[in-house]
């Protein structure tokens, strides 16, 4: 016959087990999606608008090897960042920007260029079961000799899609490239075919 004390211990054990299991279930499981880098340029600047997962980058999860945040041993760190409100996350990203910037390579005419962070916008997604997008806006100074550029970022940041925005081009002429993690883009020429086709009214 189970004594009263043994019964209490068993009861507490069951309660604690249920609590721990519930905690595990509520851990966020977010699919890792490719980032998207939209770029456009004029005579003075090359501009980027990159849609990414800021929590993923800040937590140092290697997105080149997994497709879900729960597959990483750093998932608890990711979850901690996901619980931050948008202002806290924006401030933290800005604080870490110098380190993040060192993992982004944009070369103009095959030479590394200075990248300026213009601003960051965190989407306000209150459902923690859903990953939230962040937008970072970058600019790189161009000059009259700037002919082409390449883009590459740290493989741990995962795959990224490069997309050109240019109202002077028809859709078929716009540059698009899917980059595997850590792979450098082809050379992208800044003023090649920089006009609308004569067939477009």
Q: Which residues make up each language-model segment?
A:
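Bacterial N-terminal signal peptides that target proteins for export
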Residues: 2-12
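Intrinsically disordered, low-complexity segments enriched in polar/charged small residues
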Residues: 11-14, 35
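Cleavable N-terminal signal peptides
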Residues: 15-17, 27
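N-terminal soluble domains immediately following signal/targeting peptides that reside
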Residues: 28-200
